């Protein structure tokens, strides 16, 4: 038999050790859809570059998270500071357990990415690549999210730096991040 409890205010007993706490019996859960249940963040504080025609994991931008319910979602957000050789394109994506979360449709033989950029060369970094995806993994198992990037063949991709990386005040070092939030479903 289902019941409905309608109240305008819930208050703990004044004689309780903590009268502002509502206790829930063991094994039961209060549902609050849309609330953030856990947050994790990884930062890549250094810089490096690579040249490879296939997707590569970005150093330190890997996180694992275990959802508490199959109805919960994972908000994955990446801010990646990247640059490439002049007029060379690069792509960035987030993968869950090795697979791209969302894949663009009708791409033909093009390479799938969540965001892409075109290198400005020398000391001209591109704007940060920002990805924000709401994933619905339907899982309570540990999930591993990674940021990956790749550049056109024979070109170099620079993470948190630029092609010209001399040690002077006119150059900037950046930080790239991956943030995961479990959202109650």
Task: Tell me the role of every PLM-derived stretch.
Residues 2-47:
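Glycine-rich, low-complexity segments
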Residues 3, 35, 56-58, 67-71, ...:
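Short, surface-exposed loop/turn motifs at beta-strand boundaries within globular domains
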Residues 24-26, 57, 164-165:
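Short intrinsically disordered coil segments
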